[in-house]
Swiss-Prot record:
Keywords noted in UniProt: Cytoplasm, Endonuclease, Hydrolase, Metal-binding, Nuclease, Ribosome biogenesis, rRNA processing, Zinc
Disulfide bonds: none
Species per Swiss-Prot/TrEMBL record: Chlorobium phaeovibrioides (strain DSM 265 / 1930)
Protein known as: Endoribonuclease YbeY
Molecular function via GO: metalloendopeptidase activity; RNA endonuclease activity; zinc ion binding
Protein's cellular compartments: Cytoplasm
NCBIfam families the record matches: rRNA maturation RNase YbeY
Family in the record: Belongs to the endoribonuclease YbeY family.
Cytoplasm is among the record's keywords: yes
Residues involved in Zn(2+) binding: H105, H109, D115
SUPFAM superfamilies linked: Metalloproteases ('zincins'), catalytic domain
Amino acid sequence: MTIQLHNTTRRALPEAKLKKAVRLVLSEEGGKAVSIDAIYCGGRMMRRINREFLGHDYDTDTVTFPYSEGLVVEGEFYVSLDEVGRNAVRFKSGFEQELLRVTIHSVLHLLGYDDASPEERGRMRQKEDRYLRILGAGVSSTEERSQV
């Protein structure tokens, strides 16, 4: 199992905790990672990726690229540290908690979960909350999150 973290910013990241979060989600969901690249970047890079690959010209917290289907996981995901910071303020959570949440969310996408409908978003949010609790990261209020 290969999990590579890449930080394109100058901000220090809790790499051990991030890898632990990735492994936890994979283990609990029955997944096996062949290769996962997690790229933590700034807002400009994320917006460019979102526009170039998805045709969306706006900021987002994560973009995932699954290269496999099912529980054998190969893929990459990008996380905008700028957007994580904004979300941490918006949802009154700490930066690290929000970073872990978005990382968990990204791995769930690699495993095939979607968040296109309110029901799907709710299901993913419940899983994120569960994994944050297991990691000891706590959970911020999810009332406002249910709207996004």
